[in-house]
Amino acid sequence: MKHFKQVIIMVFCVLFFSQFGNLHASEIKAVPTFHAIGLYWTPDGGSADKQVFVAFRIEGGEQWNEGLPMKYNPIGGTTEDISPYRGSIVNLTPNTTYEIKLTLEGTSISDTIVSKTWTEDFPIGETITLSDRNITYSVFDSGTKDGYLLIDGTNATIDVENNSDYCISVGGSYVIIRGFTLKNAKKCGILLTTCHDVIIENCDISGWGEKNEDGFGVNYQAGIYSESTSIKGIIVQRCKIHHPRYDANSWAELNDGGYHPSGPQGITLFNSGGNNVIRYNEIYSDSEHMFNDVIGAGTNGSFYGFPGPDSDIYSNYFANCWDDGIEAEGGNRNTRIWGNYLEEVFLPIANAATSIGPLYIWKNTSGRCYSPPGSYYGVHAPFIKMGFVGSIDWMTGHMYVFNNTILQPNNEGAGGIGVSDNANRYIKHCETRNNILDVGNASVNSISIRSENTDNNYDYDLYNGGYPADNGGHAILGTPIYIKDAYFDFDEMKADFSLNSLSLGYDAGE
């Protein structure tokens, strides 16, 4: 978005001593993806009154880029084998080596590390080319990190005609599934078992799923599915996942004794090992074949959940669900969500709760968001859910919400951050900057307001509903005015919702 200056996010927070002990003092661990590097550091002398300063540059470069100093936030009770301060450097270039320097405030304690982002050109070893078939194709063999096993389905269709549970089953690692059209699986389009480092790209998946006794789709059955907690390094890119065989119920429809939406999903990964990337996909359906969540699964009130640690979700189009467009709930340790467009969903981004963090949400845009009259939680849900599942004690991770936009087509967009039909959810450890929080109705808060909300930092947002009084003083009250030809083009997957130069908030960010 051009209306606010881009914020470079580098967050290093949360001190935790695991039952396995700490890493050696000042040892840095780096976990890269294509455009980000997650960092973990254990400096001697870390404490609540000391921030961590961050700098990075391309290896051999002269100019250091500085990050934001972050808070110290100890969390106990998890067996996750993690380091104290942690966070992410984002907006990086693939296949590029970076020098990273961390310094503990007020001390001479400093350390550096060199880390390289992922290449987008994965090496190919063996290639297996498939033609059309009507039975499941199972992948048992593995490639290596130096030579992936490519299963090439370009121009091939696997239509199992509801006679097999899956179109493709993957049990091998270092595997690329490319170019398939997958149809009519009894349960799920692609099943991932005990595998890692699997790339699913340029696939078209549709028509999967079974029907339950109430006539809705079976819960969690998905275009891409795994219930293995050991999978990690899963990349889903440039896929179209659409039109499951059956519908999910809305919050106004009884299903299996309750009103919570239940039914098919685009992607289901239960409590995975993380380091997953979901990018450049179109996951959508129609009003008669709605998803439960578009992507998600796992245990919300936990240190695990979806999408797993050190994972990225970006540049996707998500639509047509009765609950969450993106269900990023649980640990959210170095989870990064950016540049997605979501519409025809009840709730664009769910994060209840973020128990470890940090969670980054930036440059996402939501369109029409809706649930039928009589829905259990009202017609309009929050843009970002906030709150918790099970216990408020899970709300211990930090969250950073920057440069997002809530659109209000025909006044049918999402509610504010943590706000649905004027119900205000808990918010803790959240920082906002440069968001356009148009809630369409001034009687609804743009950000949840309740006395229990603590350790938050709000500023430089454009808002037209209620806004917490304890803010930084630079937020702007008003309704956005977009350029004359603001648009979203589904066929081209392009959009432009820049602010008009005469609009409040134009060029007024931090």
Question: Where are the regions that the model predicts?
Answer:
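Solvent-exposed loop/turn segments flanking beta-strands in beta-repeat/beta-sandwich domains
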Residues: D44-F56
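Structural beta-strand segments of beta-rich domains
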Residues: H35-L39
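Right-handed parallel beta-helix
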Residues: T127, Y148, D152-A156, S173-N184, ...
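Extracellular beta-strand/beta-solenoid scaffold signature
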Residues: N162-I168, N184-L191, E213-S228, N249-F270, ...
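Recognizes extended acidic, P/S/T-rich segments that occur
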Residues: F53-N95
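Extracellular beta-strand-rich solenoid/capping regions of secreted or surface-exposed proteins
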Residues: N91, R133-L150, I158-V198, K211-I231, ...
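Acidic, glycine- and Ser/Thr-rich low-complexity intrinsically disordered tracts
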Residues: T144-D146, L254-I267, N424-E510
